[in-house]
Regions:
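A membrane-topology feature that recognizes alpha-helical transmembrane segments
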Residues: 1-236
């Protein structure tokens, strides 16, 4: 990696800042403006350390601008907090498009799983709605389990199902119309349960998406550091 130890020091500093952001978001449901500003202002040091040209710098600025516009739209519809908007925009100055897209996908998986789990915990179980409550909890378990399975596959680099497992499943499947009918029933149950989960909340919750952004950022940083270290050891 261009910049050597200085690049690794910057990555460590960014990872530390992200962990601080996660802790403050959990404790106070907000991320300090000074922290977001520090992350943004440190980005030029990262560009210098990694040898970015002017064209690449302009591309990073454009990526940050697009990120800011999109996240502001989410802020307007109350799907993202102001601190989350600033943090994700600041991170867009650090990551190239491909790693940043990976960060956004990881953020969506982590944030989605966390928000659904919190909604299940906050579910208002009313008398006479036991079936719908069960569907809601089942839908949330399916959602969280699916997100965790994808995250595990990404972390280990292994597919969700091996080729042998897929072949075994295909061999044991019943007739096509039965499979389609079961799939429709599962989807209908999931949809009904999810709608009930959204409608029956004890109170309005603010999901700490800053935690998901921070953890996703640390994840991508760790991958970049390991890849760079492996490449350096191969060259040496």
């Amino acid at each position: 990696m261009p910049g050597g130890l200085f690049s690794y020091a910057l990555m460590a500093a960014l990872a530390t800042a992200l962990l601080v952001a996660a802790v403050t978001d959990i404790k106070r449901r907000e991320i300090d403006n000074t922290l977001n500003l520090a992350i943004a202002l440190a980005a030029p040091l990262w560009w210098l350390a990694t040898g970015l040209g002017w064209w690449d710098v302009g591309f990073q600025l454009a990526l940050a601008l697009v990120t800011f516009v999109v996240t502001c739209a989410l802020f307007v519809v109350r799907q993202m907090g102001g601190g989350d908007v600033k943090l994700l925009t600041a991170l867009a100055l650090w990551f190239a498009p491909a790693p940043f897209l990976q960060l956004v996908v990881l953020m969506a998986l982590l944030g989605g799983a966390g928000s659904v789990a919190m909604a299940a915990w906050n579910l208002d179980r009313r008398p006479g709605e036991s079936v719908r409550s069960a569907l809601a909890l089942g839908a949330s378990a399916l959602w969280v389990g699916g997100a965790l399975a994808v995250l595990t596959a990404l972390a280990t680099g292994r597919p969700l199902l091996s080729t042998a497992a897929l072949q075994s499943i295909r061999a044991t499947l019943p007739a096509g119309w039965i499979v389609a009918l079961i799939a429709l029933l599962v989807l209908a149950g999931f949809a009904l349960g999810f709608v009930h989960l959204v409608r029956r909340q004890k109170s309005r919750m603010r999901v700490p998406y800053g935690v998901a952004i921070a953890l996703a950022g640390v994840w991508v940083l760790a991958q970049q550091a390991l890849t760079s270290a492996a490449a350096s050891s191969t060259v040496n």
